């Protein structure tokens, strides 16, 4: 039986490269998630202002998944909703970054993979997260139209994540 053993120096070099690669992937994912979270706010703000709602109730709406109607009272709902908003953009970006680092085809198809990521996030939120939460809205706040929310997830969340992660 022929086994090849790496010297301690070679093992250390391999481990360092692995840690550096993972660190770079996580940094890109975090950057992409924060950027996409900010980018998403632009069309959301425009659409909500056009509907006479504003961005504060949109963030409170996100917080209502954990707080129920209490999310619409005071600043706690706004703060928690904003944190949840960025959580929902950072986690998929980190996952996408890990997949893209293992499957180079994902980076080559970023213009397709990004909107697909947005679809996945949209449907995951709608099918898994929201039905199992305390999500609620007062009569004065109506959720964003379905198609608008879907397109925002595809092109303001998924696409920026894929393009930022694709950059070398």
Labelled PLM ranges:
Residues 51, 127-149:
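Interfacial helix-loop-helix junctions of multi-pass membrane proteins
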Residues 1-22:
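Short, Lys/Arg-rich, polar N-terminal cytosolic tail immediately upstream
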Residues 91, 152-164:
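Hydrophobic cores of alpha-helical transmembrane segments in multi-pass inner/ER membrane proteins
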Residues 51-73:
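Membrane-interface interhelical connector segments
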Residues 20-52:
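N-terminal signal-anchor transmembrane alpha helix
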Residues 80-97:
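Hydrophobic alpha-helical transmembrane segments
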Residues 27-29, 101-124:
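Internal alpha-helical transmembrane segments of multi-pass membrane proteins
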Residues 37-41, 118-128:
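Aromatic-anchored segments of alpha-helical transmembrane domains
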